[in-house]
Design a protein with these regions (language model features):
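C-terminal substrate-binding subdomain of Rossmann-fold SDR/epimerase-dehydratase oxidoreductases
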Residues: 113-168
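A conserved pocket-lining segment of Rossmann-fold NAD(P)-dependent short-chain dehydrogenase/reductase
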Residues: 7, 85-94, 102-128
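Conserved Rossmann-fold NAD(P)-dependent oxidoreductase catalytic core, especially the SDR/UDP-sugar
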Residues: 20-60, 80
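NAD(P)H-binding glycine-rich loop region in Rossmannoid oxidoreductase-like domains
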Residues: 1-17
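Active-site helix of classical SDR
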Residues: 64
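Hydrophobic positions on the long internal alpha-helix
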Residues: 21, 25-29, 71-72, 136, ...
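Conserved sequence/active-site signature of Rossmann-fold short-chain dehydrogenase/reductase
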Residues: 2, 41, 87-89, 133, ...
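Conserved beta-loop-beta element that borders a ligand/cofactor-binding pocket
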Residues: 33, 37-38, 69-92
Length: 168
């Protein structure tokens, strides 16, 4: 399951999907695994974070992804983990638009209502286009790269994001 709202609907199914399926994979597959995790494993922290920053997940989604990472790291599999930022953009004709993400919410409101409301706005979002994930991951399919890597293109406040949308 992806995202806080979807995971909160059915915690048991979330754990089965995000944690137990990874455990089953590592127990039955001896090959290399490239795993998409999330920057949400860090929780709410100040300052610039890197891959060695302490984790502190604040949601079931983030907890389940971190637990899956730990299973992968303790397995004998060769594992490459990408901690993805907040994804945006349509990837293909089968993708669904996530209307729970701030970028999409603000854009939809700007288009349909002609205005956006931002409360606070100081929260940061590590944005990442879905095609940038593919650009980063594809070269690693045929390598032996391992480890954990944060993957995002821009860390922007919600207010800055609203201003960018407004300027378009």
């Amino acid at each position: 399951f992806v995202g806080d709202p979807a995971c909160a609907i059915n915690p048991k199914l979330t754990r089965q999907t995000n944690v137990e399926s990874v455990r089953n994979l590592t127990n039955s597959f001896g090959g290399r695994i490239i795993f998409p995790s999330t920057c949400s494993v860090y929780g709410a922290q100040d300052g610039i974070l890197d891959e060695d920053s302490p984790t502190g997940p604040l949601s079931l989604y983030a907890e389940s992804k971190l637990e899956a990472e730990q299973i992968l790291k303790s397995s004998t599999n060769s594992t490459l983990i990408f901690r993805l930022g907040t994804l945006f953009g349509m990837s293909d004709q089968f993708a669904r638009l996530r209307v729970d993400l701030v970028l999409n919410v603000l854009t939809i409101r700007a288009i349909l209502e002609g205005s956006m409301s931002v409360f606070g706005g100081a929260q940061y979002r590590p944005l990442l286009h879905v095609r940038d994930v593919a650009t980063a991951a594809i070269p690693h399919i045929s390598t032996n790269s391992t480890g954990i890597y944060n993957l995002h293109t821009e860390n922007i406040t919600v207010l800055e994001l609203a201003e960018k949308i407004r300027s378009v």
